[in-house]
Amino acid sequence: EAWARQHGIRRAAEDSTRIALIAVDVQNTFCLPDFELYVGGRSGRGAVEDNRRLVEFVYHNLGAITQIYPTLDTHQAAQIFHALFFVDAEGHHPGPMTTVTVQDVENGVWRFNADLAPSLGIDAGYAQQHLLHYTRTLEATGRYALTVWPYHAMLGSIGHALVPAFEEAMFFHSVARRSQPSFQVKGDETLTEHYSALGPEVLSGPDGAAIGAPNMALIH
């Protein structure tokens, strides 16, 4: 705070033009080598360089950014995009990056792992029905099929945490500008994927019941 006063950095509440910085999934699991889904790009250092540029951007624009909105991809083991959710006829789980299509579900190639039903508080028959509904809904959108991702961004893990350099820059901003960051948790619904911070990929189950909702607070 003393540093901010010395350098003429105002409180965010005094901004006449309010600027939000939305930082999408700047987490170890995606952004640092040797973590689960590191995005290296062609150079092998893509996400690392992105982190560096982002941190520099925060410090260079400290007095202009009103509030920072970091999104946090947040998962547990038993979710519709993880291997534990599925079994084949012999009880085996799919490997990472397996695609689960409508035909796979219809033909019994992959089905819901009924052992999870008590823990998830759902009926195994309903979960199987949901899996068919879900893959059909994805196919109807024409975007992609259901992918079984490696376990990543696991809640409470080091991989789930923000990249340390960015977290430090965000903390510095929050103190200097007296502006609390607004964390946007996504991806914690069991029965739907949630790539965008604005909302999940599928909003309802086969019975019409909601399985997720758009993030209206962030949208507005």
Where are these regions (language model features)?
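Active-site-adjacent betaalpha module
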Residues: 1-69, 75-220
